[in-house]
Structure formats: structure tokens, C-alpha cells
Amino acid sequence: MLCQLAGIEGIRIWHDQTLQKPAWGNPSSWHMDVPNWSFHSPDAISIWIALNDATIQNGCMYYLPGSHRKADFQRKGGFGPDVGALFGQYPEFQT
């Protein structure tokens, strides 16, 4: 499926991980995966597959629509819990 979406013949899996959080755990802050990897390629594909039901009530994944087209993928540090910092850096994503 990824090959079809990316229009390529094959992929190489560089990294996999399982993120396990308790039901009462803190949410992950806004971030981009690519700047934290040990290589720099805007062509890399990151996917997230939920192993349990992911709902708004229990903290589902949320992507900013269009952010993959506008972001520069350079390491800039985390945004932490201050979502406003994200929109200060990328005002075009603010609604």
C-alpha cells in the first residue's frame, strides 16, 4: 500500500517501535517524527497503526492537514504542551 501511495517500487523499513501508554498517561506533545531520525529525507514515510480502538475520548492520533507539504523537516526542538508554539512557527496551519 505504501509503495502505491508513494508511486515507488519498494520500501526499506528503517525503524519500528511499540509505544505503550497507561490509560491515565500524559498525551504526546505536537511533534514531527522526521527531524528526530538519524537521517534527513523529506521523502521518508512515517505511519501509525493503532492496536486498540483510538477515539477522541482516549487520545487518538491527529495530523495537521497539509503539514507534510509545508513543513521544512529541520530539527527545531519540541513544542511541548504549548500548542500555540506550533501555530506561531507554522501560522498557515491555524484555523
Where on the chain are the PLM-derived regions?
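Short, basic and Ser/Thr-rich N-terminal targeting/leader segments
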Residues: 12-14, 23, 43, 57
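Non-heme Fe(II)/2-oxoglutarate
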Residues: 1, 24-27, 63
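Short Gly/Pro-enriched turn/cap motifs at secondary-structure boundaries
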Residues: 37-38, 95
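Signature of the catalytic double-stranded beta-helix
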Residues: 1-17, 38-40, 51
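Double-stranded beta-helix
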Residues: 54-95
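Short, conserved beta-strand element in jelly-roll/cupin
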Residues: 31, 38-56, 86-87
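Short, surface-exposed recognition loops or helix-turn segments adjacent to catalytic cores
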Residues: 13-21, 61-64
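Short acidic (Asp/Glu) patches
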Residues: 23-35
